[in-house]
Amino acid sequence: MTPIHRIVCPIDFSPASANAMRVAIDYARAFKAEIHAVHAYQLSAYASPNSDLARDLEEQIRKEVEAFLATIETFGVPVKMALRLGVPYIEIVEAARELNAELVVMGTTGKTGIQHLLLGSVAERVVRTADVPVLSVRYVEPKS
């Protein structure tokens, strides 16, 4: 079995990504690995990457990522944060490559039909293009 030292866990502040982070923490504890929480985002067509708007947005996103991660018990597992500007699935795959991660753990909601056709699936694209194994963790909404 290939040892796992680094796990990339993409986050988008959704319950599905929180669920995936908990699974990534379980794997990290078992393998004594570190987690890189990656949030990839795109700018609007009206903002250049070097504009004040882009810098303000990055700072706002950084705070949101920190707040999101603060809600998840890590059990002492090191979690590093990375913000990536660009097409989400490409940035996730590139982050895994650059970090020499051995595993990507990401949430999915299992959308199908029109919703899947219109929005696509970041998880599906990561699975298709990543150089390392991708564990897709399906999130099922609790019934009320």
Predicted regions and their residues:
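Intrinsically disordered or low-complexity boundary/linker segments at protein termini
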Residues: 1-19, 75, 128-144
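Structural beta-alpha unit
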Residues: 2, 23, 70-104, 142-144
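Small/aliphatic-rich secondary-structure junction motif
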Residues: 2-51, 55
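Short glycine/serine/threonine/alanine-rich loop segments
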Residues: 27, 31-34, 77, 101, ...
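General small-molecule cofactor/ligand-binding pocket signal
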Residues: 38, 80-84, 135
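Short beta->alpha linker loops
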Residues: 41, 60, 83-87, 109
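Short, surface-exposed alpha-helical segments at coil->helix boundaries
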Residues: 54-66
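Gly/Ser-rich helix-loop-strand patches that form or flank binding pockets
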Residues: 95-144
